[in-house]
């Protein structure tokens, strides 16, 4: 985009239009779909993804949609970004200890009220980064939901409290609830 060559922004616009058209899957799950067959039908059997959600991928799409909305404002970008940002705290966040989970099952089984963790309660540093970026960027650009700033600040506090090694000067890449 720094080249000011219009073909790059047109390419991005086409990419984001495609994301808005095919990734939402709210009739099936609060999480977006990430894997597709050539005809855009959902691939719910691919690798580790299967019928699962990578929380950080959802959050990354939300903040990138917001950035694209700033470049080429479209209601579809704003709506989808908000759908993602509104779904994650209730479905992909550890509301007891803080932080965003790694992978979640995309659907509930009979009788369940909460989405299940795929393997464990791991929280990866990059997932926290995506959440912090998503909620700070959306709070700043849209300024329409005060809870976004709250989620950004809570995510930042969680990251600073659990991922930074204050004794050795390093970082932890993953943390678990225990």
Residue ranges, per PLM feature:
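Glycan-recognition and catalytic cores of secretory/periplasmic carbohydrate-active enzymes
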Residues: 1-178
